[in-house]
């Protein structure tokens, strides 16, 4: 055992219950010879969590935490991100990216409670998650020891992992292996790897979990009304709900209509491109409805400036900078812009499409029929537009005149 290993007395492991983190748990026990605490965050994975406690104990965990973080996840992580209308590279609603900071936060809280001197995760050395986890760890404790097995061990193939599992009595799932990996929470489910690495191949229909195939969705559209207060969704069809309940409800409705499927070849933080296929039914509906209420309540120039910040905000979330001062600065500006975003949006769901068909605000509407109508001239003198156009065209006319002299 290396000296660095001897210095570690207790490790808190972010444990999913899958084969990889089960192998990691046993490997930590074997290589570090210390106490290992397994921690699983309930972010809405569903049935996946049921066997985790027994599995962790059977694999060698000295203690197990399974914490229900669904409400905190949606209220303090998903909703702030949706107030920013964040979207990565035009398609990805950041379902995995936004989950990692919360998992790391609770993991570090457990480390403090338990007096652990190290934390560990199951992210590979090629992916984004190692960065997201570890940036968060160091935010909470700059001196924490991070154990990243994928960057240490020599188990560099799937067969090597299987052999290690067999040697150490770790159960290997007997169910037919699906040729892709997945990650699920209340905001989305993601798929990557395996057959999806063929960028020309269409994902098989049996891969999808949350959504019906659009062509098999109901032939009749469904209309949904979503109420917002200060930029946060608070009710669906007039029924008040908690953040997690609301998102779960929209996931079900959206899934029935095939809403929220995305197939993206994205740029990872580490520099390589990677294909991700995502199902985000509730999130897709929320973003559409939120934008609709903004249209009727938000000042034009405030919206323009906020919109210019969306790519940077999304990049920070994707790259793992949730706890950074720059993300917090942007959040302050964005949240100030959301004070007026109070109203209701009506969206139409039909065979994979989510479209706004109405929006209203009783308290913050900036739409005035007298100003906007094409039928009256009582409050807007159309002749005034002549001066407006001439002033705004000045730089273009000067440019044309100067080019004419060349």
From Swiss-Prot:
Q: Which terms are listed as keywords in the entry?
A: Amino-acid biosynthesis, Arginine biosynthesis, ATP-binding, Cytoplasm, Ligase, Nucleotide-binding
Question: Where does it primarily localize?
Answer: cytoplasm
The entry lists its GO molecular-function terms as: argininosuccinate synthase activity; ATP binding
Decide whether keyword Repeat is in the record.
no
> Where would you find this protein in the cell?
Cytoplasm
Its EC number is 6.3.4.5
Coiled coil regions in record:
none
Sites binding L-citrulline sit at: 92, 97, 128, 132, 181, 190, 266, 278
The record, for CDD domains, names: ASS (cd01999)
Q: Establish whether keyword Cytoplasm is in the entry.
A: yes
Per the record, the pathway is: Amino-acid biosynthesis; L-arginine biosynthesis; L-arginine from L-ornithine and carbamoyl phosphate: step 2/3
> What does the entry list as the binding residues for L-aspartate?
124, 128-129
Q: Which domain of life is it from?
A: Bacteria
Question: Looking at the UniProt record for this protein, which Gene Ontology cellular component terms does it annotate, in alphabetical order?
Answer: cytoplasm
- Which InterPro entries does this UniProt record tie to the protein? Arginosuc_syn_C, Arginosuc_syn_N, Arginosuc_synth, Arginosuc_synth_CS, Arginosuc_synth_type_1_subfam, AS_cat/multimer_dom_body, Rossmann-like_a/b/a_fold
Q: Which reaction does it catalyse?
A: L-citrulline + L-aspartate + ATP = 2-(N(omega)-L-arginino)succinate + AMP + diphosphate + H(+)
Annotated residues for binding of ATP = 14-22, 41, 122
- Among the record's GO biological process terms, what is one? L-arginine biosynthetic process
Family annotation (Pfam families): Arginosuc_syn_C, Arginosuc_synth
Entry similarity comment: Belongs to the argininosuccinate synthase family. Type 1 subfamily.
**Oligomeric and partner information:** Homotetramer.
> What is the name of the protein in this document?
Argininosuccinate synthase
Q: What is the originating organism of this protein? A: Geobacter sulfurreducens (strain ATCC 51573 / DSM 12127 / PCA)
């Amino acid at each position: 055992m290396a000296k660095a290993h001897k210095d570690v007395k207790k490790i808190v492991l972010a444990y999913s219950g899958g084969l990889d983190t089960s192998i990691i748990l046993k490997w930590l026990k074997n290589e570090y010879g210390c106490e290992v605490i397994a921690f699983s965050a309930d972010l809405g994975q569903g049935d996946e969590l049921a066997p985790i406690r027994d599995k962790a104990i059977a694999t060698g965990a000295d203690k197990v935490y399974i914490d229900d973080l669904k409400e905190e996840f949606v209220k303090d992580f998903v909703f702030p991100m949706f107030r920013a209308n964040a979207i990565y590279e035009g398609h990805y609603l950041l379902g995995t990216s936004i989950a990692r900071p919360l998992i790391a936060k609770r993991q570090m809280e457990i480390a403090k409670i338990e007096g652990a001197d190290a934390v560990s995760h199951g992210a590979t050395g090629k992916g984004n998650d190692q960065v997201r986890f570890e940036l968060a760890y160091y935010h909470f404790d700059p001196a924490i020891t991070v154990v990243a097995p994928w960057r240490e061990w020599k188990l560099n193939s799937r067969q090597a992992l299987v052999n290690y599992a067999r040697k150490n009595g770790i159960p290997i799932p007997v169910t037919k292996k699906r040729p892709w990996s997945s990650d699920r929470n209340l905001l989305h489910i993601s798929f990557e790897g395996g057959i999806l690495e063929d960028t020309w191949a269409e994902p098989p229909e049996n891969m999808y979990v949350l959504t019906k195939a659009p062509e098999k969705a109901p032939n009749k559209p469904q209309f949904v009304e979503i109420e917002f207060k200060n930029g946060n969704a608070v009710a669906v069809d007039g029924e008040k709900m908690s953040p997690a309940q609301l998102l779960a409800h929209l996931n079900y409705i959206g899934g029935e209509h095939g809403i929220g499927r995305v197939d993206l070849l994205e740029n990872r933080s580490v520099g390589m491109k990677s294909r991700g296929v995502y199902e985000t039914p509730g999130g897709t509906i929320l973003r559409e409805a939120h934008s609709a209420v903004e249209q009727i309540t938000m000042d034009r120039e405030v919206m323009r400036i906020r919109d210019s910040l969306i790519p940077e905000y999304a990049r920070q979330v994707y790259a793992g900078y949730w706890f950074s001062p720059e993300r917090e600065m942007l959040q302050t500006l964005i949240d100030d812009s959301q004070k007026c975003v109070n109203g209701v949006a009506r969206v139409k769901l039909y065979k994979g499409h989510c479209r706004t068909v109405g929006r209203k605000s009783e308290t913050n509407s900036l739409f005035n029929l007298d100003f906007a109508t094409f039928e009256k001239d009582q409050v807007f003198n159309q002749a005034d537009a002549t001066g407006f156009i001439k002033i705004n065209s000045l730089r273009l006319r000067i440019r044309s005149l100067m080019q004419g002299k060349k």
